[in-house]
Amino acid sequence: MSEIIESVKNLSIGFNSQKGKQISILRNVSTNIKKGETVGIVGESGSGKSTLALAMMGYIKQGLFPLKGECLFKSEDLLKMSSRQLEKIRGRKIAMIPQNAGQALTPNLKIGYQIDEALRLHTDLNKTERDKKISELLNKVRLPSPETMAFRYPHELSGGQQQRVAVAMALAGKPDLLLLDEPTTGLDVTTQAHVLELLRFIAKDTGTSMIYVSHDLGAIAQVSDRIVVMYAGEIVLEGPARKILKEPIHPYTYGLLKSIPKLSLAGLPASMPGSQPQPGSINEGCSFYDRCNLATDNCKKNSPDLEHIKELDTNVRCFNYKELINQNNNLQTSITKKSNNSEANEVLKLKDVSISYAKQKFFDQLLNKISDQNPTVKDINLSLIHI
């Protein structure tokens, strides 16, 4: 059995309203992070995913406080530690890769100096060893010319390069657990893919456990071994990534997957009606009741517990999950259809299109000679249909 790095037990976090009422934004959350495991925490804004992840570093946002429960890192409760005790853990044992690396990096300090600062804080290396380690870290995150890169300022790097530097700084202390809070926000699709591939490599190469927080289920699916789906401050589904993506047996997760656009299918992706309930507004019943097509009177009156489904190795918070098990062969069937008649709806068609430009020199131009052709586009076929 794999070693558990961190365990969250019955954690509730809340705040006091202006009327003095205690309101929960995390409710009875329990989960484990195993050694070498990457866990994706996904949910809409306000679902509590970032609050949970930060609590797993021993950090509670200003104005919030733990109502009950524990965050045990190697059997020690982070929520009961002093600031001095947490300083010895953060960076050295638990590190965080921020959402916006451009804002997290100090603009007037060179990259190498900032990584060196992390090494000075979290390791016992001397100056010569640190200089060597800086090059090793920059090389590990696949930045070109590490020796040159170390002398650049953050503004001289692209967004993807800045994110790689943030990863290098987080790895400086050789942490057991990495927290990634929306690390690809603001990056273009290609750069995002490169960063996600890098994270997969680092997880495999170093054996570091990771918590990946995002609202993007597609990104979560690419890096996670296990997925935790949160809604209105509760875990509604938890299990192996492949199982959840193939058989999303909670209606909220089912809706999230239906909302992902697919190039292979025509039509618009589905959207879920309504929005999450506000903190403190749920008095009884299932928190997803108002948005659920499977809801019954039982769902309105009673709140489901997180039930373990042994055959799927999955935990689900739903009375009617069995109704979803037989609906998972093709998530898009009910909302879209494949286009079988593209000719009838075709508005634009390119067939075997090639475009070249001439590498024409000055004297060739005077003599009206035909120069060598340099192809830029070759044999393109494209069909645009009206939906």
Listing of model-derived features with the role each one plays in the protein:
Residues 4, 147, 240-346:
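Short catalytic/signature loops enriched in Gly
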Residues 65-77:
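Conserved ABC transporter NBD signature motif
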Residues 152-157, 161:
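Conserved ABC ATPase signature
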Residues 172-176:
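A short, proline-enriched helix->beta-strand linker immediately N-terminal to the Walker B motif
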Residues 187-268:
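P-loop NTP-binding/switch modules centered on Walker-like glycine-rich loops
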Residues 385-387:
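Conserved small/polar residues in nucleotide/adenosyl-binding loops
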